[in-house]
């Protein structure tokens, strides 16, 4: 729930009511609700439940992380300026800057706000892929190529935070030796040894 206009107060209040309603609706199935941060942008009077609610903190102008923590929300750090992939769009990232993320970023960095490491209300981080431009030639394989190095890098950062002891250059070389999983080869790797990958036979009648 985000990116609604806040120009009209009645719309803001309905948006907040909508958000609160569906938080409770999801919880009615025994699940934890997760919302996209918008309650700074949609500031109003209608209360929105915060206890045991996860909020994806993606843009501080929409949800000020300090204020959201004060209100009681648990945050997932997904700042758009670092962790948004929009394939072949010309804005955000086509591929994440994994070196910068590995060396400098942790979930405690939400936009320009930096919180203490292992803050009890910051539950982790994630990246996002948004396929804004359908039909631009990007296939599911292309998305895989963009996602896999991001996944490897963020897996390390979720585990170690700021305490990455292995130099990035060593990590980056080592990650290339890891397979996607037993028997999985979505990337279509063929190895370093030259070999035929396609043979065409001509049959004579």
PLM segments and residue spans:
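Active-site neighborhood of glycoside hydrolase catalytic domains
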Residues: 1-54, 58-72
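Structural recognition of the beta-strand scaffold that forms the well-ordered cores
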Residues: 33-36, 54-57, 75-78, 124-128, ...
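Short flexible/disordered coil segments
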Residues: 35, 39-60, 92-116, 186-204
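Tryptophan-centered motif/residue detector
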Residues: 36, 56-58, 84, 130-135, ...
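A glycine-rich phosphate-binding loop feature that marks nucleotide/adenosyl-phosphate handling sites
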Residues: 38-45, 82-85, 171-173
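Histidine/acidic-residue-rich catalytic or RNA/ligand-binding cores of hydrolases
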Residues: 46-47, 86-94, 136-140
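C-terminal functional modules
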Residues: 117-205
């Amino acid at each position: 729930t985000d990116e609604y206009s806040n120009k009209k107060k009645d719309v803001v209040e309905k948006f907040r009511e909508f958000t609160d309603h569906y938080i409770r609706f999801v919880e009615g199935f025994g699940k934890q609700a997760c919302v996209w941060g918008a309650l700074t942008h949609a500031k109003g009077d209608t209360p929105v439940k915060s206890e045991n609610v996860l909020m994806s903190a993606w843009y501080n102008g929409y949800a000020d992380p300090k204020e959201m923590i004060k209100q009681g929300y648990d945050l997932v750090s997904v700042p758009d300026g670092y962790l948004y992939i929009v394939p072949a769009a010309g804005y955000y990232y086509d591929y994440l800057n994994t070196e910068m993320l590995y060396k400098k970023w942790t979930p405690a960095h939400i936009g320009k706000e930096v919180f203490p490491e292992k803050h009890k209300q910051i539950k982790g981080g994630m990246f996002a892929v948004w396929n804004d431009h359908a039909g631009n030639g990007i296939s599911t394989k292309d998305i895989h190529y963009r996602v896999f190095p991001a996944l490897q890098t963020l897996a390390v950062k979720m585990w170690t935070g700021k305490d990455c002891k292995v130099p990035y250059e060593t990590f980056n070389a080592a990650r290339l030796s890891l397979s996607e999983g037993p028997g999985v080869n979505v990337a279509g790797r063929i190895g370093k040894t030259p070999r035929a990958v396609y043979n065409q036979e001509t049959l004579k009648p």
